Amino acid sequence: MKIFLSIYFGFLISYFSYTQHYPHDHMQYDFIDQKHNELVIFNKKKWSSFLSKIHNQWHYGGEEINIIQFGGSHIQADVWSNRLRDHFQHIVPYNGAARGLYFPFKLIKSNASPYLKTTHNGEWKGFRNSVSYHHSPFGLLGARAELIDSTSFITFYVNKEHCVNCYFDQIDFLIHDSLNNHCIDILTDSIVSIELDTDRQSFILSNLVDSVAVLIERESHEKGKFSLFGLNFSSQLKGITYHSVGVNGASVPSYLRCEYFMDQIDLVNPDLIIFSIGINDAYEPSFLSETYFKNYDTCLLYTSPSPRDETK
């Protein structure tokens, strides 16, 4: 059951103030009047169903709950969003969920999460849905890296200073390989299963890890085009997975450019979708509220369940 919540200029959560585990300190500002924070629920039945899953996870465990939030630079930076993720990881004793969706922005020379880090060699070219002259296609994560060299060696590793017990045992690569002549090789002997599809490759490991090394290599002289749209780090353990998707400068139309959005969102099957976009729309001199609301409505329609899904 999917729940859809639009948040235009901010989203503050006090529900999880129960926990004392904070990855960052934060300031209290007098000019923020939290009495005006309000959640408007349009479908109380769905909302109650979502809260019921949260309740069961809190008390008993065993639930698979996926929350995905879309935003701009505040989400790409991953400081605030990782705080939410850290809360979800530590607020209940049963939560073993992994990182979730991730784009390695270092590959395209942009700022990346300080919590799941990457190093790499090999040259890549970057594209973002927020840059008008960056051509498509784009996927769920709003960015794309195209491999220029014939090989690239990438390591992904958890920053243990800020993320305790952050492990994964499955990695999904969201890709497009125009000539099907590139190989993704996970450099470990603990692979138990590999699933290869046209635009997705999944690797299941025999044990939980907090780092992995990957070799992407072209296998023929024909160049073709290898595009990486992002990854999903998941775990067989149950719990709340908080996926954060952010691109510097992203506006509402930016995500409407992502033609692989719906194909790739099935990978996480979200229970709750949060749109935290709008600031980059509103400050433009050409801003029109009618266009803004129309674009937002289109986003909501794209991500709303079909009538058939409503009956499930």
Locate the predicted segments by residue.
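Bacterial Sec-dependent N-terminal signal peptides
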Residues: 1-26
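Sec-dependent signal peptide cleavage junction
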Residues: 18-55
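Alpha-helical scaffolding within the catalytic cores
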Residues: 45-56, 255-264, 301
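A short, charged/proline- and glycine-enriched loop
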Residues: 61-65
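Short hydrophobic beta-strand that contains or immediately precedes a catalytic carboxylate
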Residues: 68-71
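Conserved SGNH/GDSL esterase-like catalytic core that processes O-acyl groups on lipids
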Residues: 74-187, 193-298
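Single conserved hydrophobic/aromatic residue that forms the stacking wall/gate
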Residues: 302-312
